[in-house]
Amino acid sequence: MIRNYSFLSQLNEVKKDQTGTGLLIENDGHIIPPKDTISQIKEDIDSGHKFVMPDDFIVSAVFQKYGIKNANGRIYPENVLKTQVEKYIQERVATGCAIGALDHPQASSLSGHDVAMNILNLEWQGRTLVGEMKLHLSPGYKRYGICSTSGDLVANMLLDNILIGVSSRGVGSVKNQGGVLIVDDDYDIICWDVVMEASTPGAMIKLNRADLQPFIESKTHENTPINEKISRLEKILL
């Protein structure tokens, strides 16, 4: 089922360190270009060969984490985020329409010009949601390096070694519980977009799954005061 999010234009964004109900935007990752692919393209260009991009430009990513306080001061409980991710996988990823834009478009729905990538798969590793996305490239960019789509721009920035992020868009409520901002169970994922910033600690897009390992949060984590408070809350929330 594809949802209608036309009502989003009427919602206010719940900003950093705020409570309330509305649009929740989390900048959750960085894109780092696939080294072998980028090196080969640059080598071909330097050698005077024809500019050719691979047919499938795919990168791995950390998309989001549960139980970890992000830069917006919010924590997504395990049951809330896992439930919504599973729904997103069934409704979007499995049907080949898990598309995202470059930057968050002002409109509530994507046009063809907005599409920058399509998420191919998502899976959990501990507290961390990882997966792969395929950049949406035009024939003109693949053959001649001419940018005409958002996906072309993303690929071109990766060629220039620019760090790019991934950001989730969703709708839901944030409540203050014991001094910690918790995303409530009315949360609903809309999509992930490609952006220029990130808010989830250590969430990055990498060459492959092995490169993601240093940024993946396991079920057990350091017993700092904030983590101890979070753990106590999780026993109530999960």
Feature annotation, model-predicted:
Residues 4-19, 120-222:
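Residue microenvironments linked to proteolytic maturation
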Residues 57, 95-98, 115, 127-129, ...:
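A generic structural signal for short beta-strands and their flanking turns/coil linkers
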Residues 65-75, 106-111, 138-146:
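Short, surface-exposed beta-strand/loop "edge" segments at domain boundaries and coil↔beta transitions
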